[in-house]
Amino acid sequence: MVTSSSVIGLTLWAALVSASPVADPLVTPAPKLEDLEKRATSCTFSGSEGASSASKSKTSCSTIVLSDVAVPSGTTLDLTDLNDGTHVIFEGETHFGYEEWSGPLVSVSGTDITVTGADGAYLNGDGSRWWDGEGSNGGKTKPKFFYAHDLTSSTISGIYIQNSPVQVFSIDGSTYLTMEDITIDNTDGDDGEAANTDGFDIGDSTYITITGANVYNQDDCVAVNSGENIYFSGGVCSGGHGLSIGSVGGRSDNTVKNVTFYDSDIKSSQNGVRIKTIYGDTGSVSEVTYKEITLSDITDYGIVVEQNYDDTSESPTDGITIEDFVLDNVQGSVESSGTNIYIVCGSDSCTDWTWTDVDVTGGKTSSDCENVPDDISC
């Protein structure tokens, strides 16, 4: 039953509502269909047409799955300028056709990009087709493998690369890039034919973090040529030239600052800890730390600093300073034919070095060190 008081109340409420101003409804434009598709589409590419199809369709896919892709000779698997947030997944074997050219075989760029390798996936460079003992210094022209250029706030993880023709990862112009659990396996190049197979070459980049890398190669495991805020930890480096700063010099950017190598093993390598700066050039190396580094079976130098790199017959020069160089708990063995520590500094370019718990033994003691900083033993 409806009472008279109810009717009066409803009438008053209706009058108030009709008299009150009504705010304009908040209108949100509907997303464009093509934008939704870009964010939601998963695309799978495979076979000999997979690389070109992926390159053409890359901006239409939020997830790009590369399954047993065969990249044609002389071409790049081009994953540059991806949409923000794109996820790239490698499955099976990615193979590359043979041609003498400079590469790269793979190139990725963008913001908030994730690149991962599925279980059992690997990128097979089949480098023996190019290996001639000359590396990038002559002989056949060899393609670099993987350009991680102009990546921002991105992650590369679980990638397995086998038998790179020459340098593997080129990291350039990137910031806030994390690389996790990367494997580089160039063991087949140990017959003396593979050369300059650097693991990670870093230039003009900031906030680069590399963790859990396992590298077997024939050159620098890591080479920081320029950049700031670089962190490498939990790595194993075998067969190559060790954990390196440089060579620094000869580029438009010759500044290296705030680099840490932490909790890593260097095995059966030519060098362990290494800083190399170009003779006669200018620049700076500062705030470099090697902490908890273990060396074993090093053939040439356990710890080496060369300020006459590229012209070792000349006296070192002062143009590139090495300041605030910290070694903390760096220990291990050098073969008897090698040298434990070798330092060649300019007359006034190596300052503020702090070495603690450094114990490198088994090799020779050098009598050729020059301008060794105070409180440092050569």
Curated annotation (Swiss-Prot):
Domain of life where this protein originates: Eukaryota
Keyword terms of this UniProt record: Cell wall biogenesis/degradation, Cleavage on pair of basic residues, Disulfide bond, Glycoprotein, Glycosidase, Hydrolase, Repeat, Secreted, Signal, Zymogen
GO biological process: cell wall organization; pectin catabolic process
Disulfide bonds: 43-61, 221-237, 345-350, 369-378
PbH1 repeats by residue range: 103-125, 174-204, 205-226, 256-277, 285-307, 317-345
The keyword Repeat belongs to this UniProt entry's keyword annotation: yes
MF-aspect GO terms: polygalacturonase activity
Compartment list: Secreted
InterPro entries registered for this protein in UniProt: Glyco_hydro_28 (IPR000743), Glycosyl_hydrlase_28 (IPR050434), PbH1 (IPR006626), Pectin_lyas_fold (IPR012334), Pectin_lyase_fold/virulence (IPR011050)
Active-site annotation: 219 (proton donor), 241
The keyword Zinc-finger appears for this protein: no
Reaction it catalyzes: (1,4-alpha-D-galacturonosyl)n+m + H2O = (1,4-alpha-D-galacturonosyl)n + (1,4-alpha-D-galacturonosyl)m
CC per GO annotation: extracellular region
Residues carrying sugar: 258
EC number: 3.2.1.15
Pfam families per UniProt: Glyco_hydro_28
pH-activity dependence text: Optimum pH is 3.8.
Main location (coarse class): secreted
Position of the signal peptide: 1-19
Role, per record: Involved in maceration and soft-rotting of plant tissue. Hydrolyzes the 1,4-alpha glycosidic bonds of de-esterified pectate in the smooth region of the plant cell wall.
Annotated protein name in UniProt: Endopolygalacturonase E
Gene this protein is translated from: pgaE
